[in-house]
Amino acid sequence: MVKTSILIIFFSIIMSAPANNIKQLNVDTTSGATNVVSTSAGKETVTDNELIAKGAKVEKLADGFRFTEGPAVDKKGNVYFTDQPNNRILIWSVKDEKLSVFHENCGRANGLYFDKKGNLLSCSDMDNEIWKFDMDGNHVVLISDFEGKKMNGPNDLWVHPNGGIYFTDPLYKRDYWTRDPKMQQDGEYVYYLSPDYKKVMRVDSEIEKPNGIIGSPDGKHLYVADIKASKTYVYDIQPDATLTNKKLFTNMGSDGVTIDSQGNLYLTGRGVTVFNPKGEKIAHIPVEAGWTANVCFGGKDMKTLFITASENLYSIRMNVKGTR
């Protein structure tokens, strides 16, 4: 997830919606408003591929945000995502295809992920913490420091089947920080938070700038994108949550990462690039927006790929299912 303070200067600034927990956003066609749309994404086309539904196109679902990030799917297939500079989390309902606000003043949430109990976890960048939201919008702070020092800025996260949380902690200096903007830890690392939220440990300290992160559904492998080094790594996850057997998966970094039921990995940046479990490129989904930040599968059948890109939310129908 790239430094939004640089990217958002290219995007139009919009006013945040009024604060309440969950409410419907009004569809407004005036300049700068958040709009729900249903048009194809420009002239972008997708090369025929067995992963992608026949004739499918990238569709723009909504626009007018400042910078979209962190899509995550709930048990019903609804997709939650962040409008990070506007400090809010939104919901795209798959039932009625409408947009609503889940939470405002969400700690500048970035990466999101649901735990097995249906709580929404967020990398809340305002104070460099990880938050847990219940579905009423109440939150608790799960972590804010390591060994007595503030985190640099938790960026993205994945929940292991055992309930533990793997997360990345790069440094992207934010203009809204009141803290010292210098590096808080002695590097930009990957961490693990135990299922009871009591133990935190570094699991990879030999990485330049970890960003996107995802694990295999069986909990045996972890994938971490090093966006600075333009590499993505795969690790074996041990019973004690440590990582071993680190290998280069592909020579491409990524802002966000997701995985499908066949084990294919979806990396972002300039559109969405898909790699098979061997690390071989097998598809590319172009997106008209200048920067594609993150992706997740959603929908009732988990066969829709949702894409957060710049000031927009997109989707495309797939032949493969995502995983939770």
Stretches found by the model and what they are:
Residues M1-V2:
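N-terminal secretory signal peptides that target proteins for export/translocation
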Residues S5-S16:
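Bacterial N-terminal signal peptides
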Residues P18-R324:
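Sequence-structural signature of mature extracellular/luminal beta-sheet repeat domains
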